Amino acid sequence: MTKASSEDLCQLAHRNDGLACVVLRVARFFVEGDDMPDLYDGRSQDNIKANEYACRRVALEDAVDAHLNAAQRAPQLGFGRYLVSATTPFTRDDLTQLRTDAASVFARRVPLAAAVWTQRGWRFPDRLDRVYVNSRARRDLNWRPRFDLNAVAARLARGQSVHTPLSQLVGSKAYAHSSYHRGVFAPARP
């Protein structure tokens, strides 16, 4: 069963039986190293995670808040699918350039991050193939995420970690000795 088919079953349960179901598609929030680090052209794990706050990451605190708001709003919503991610600094007008020259768009949209990245010797991605937009979740769930790329850049400028307070408290929950941490996950064959 796929995630999409599971979501469809939730929608059927709402339609057929009136069960309130709110589906949250949660962006990356884990502190573990990326499973495909070779794709990032020598960027550090912190650089990768910080960049992702613009397009495909959410702070653990914000993910928790989204779940609490969804549980509270479910009876009024009935059914809904929502993307839970940091608020992107990009607009629809940026999408074409993000495919070919993302670094320029980052520098234009988030100048604080551009300055902090330069100080750290970090780089923005050359191109982005996706940008998660959380506007429906913010509107319908009355959700106000606190951590976006500007907030992360401000934390870094103050000498704080790219990892938010809750993610530091929770830490890594990696599976010890799994092949997942050495590349793309591939189940062992008998």
Show where each model-derived region lies.
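Residues in well-ordered alpha-helical elements
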Residues: E61-V64, S135, R146, N150
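Mid/C-terminal beta-alpha module of Rossmann-like enzyme folds, strongest
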Residues: V64-D129, N134, R139-D140, H163-Q168, ...
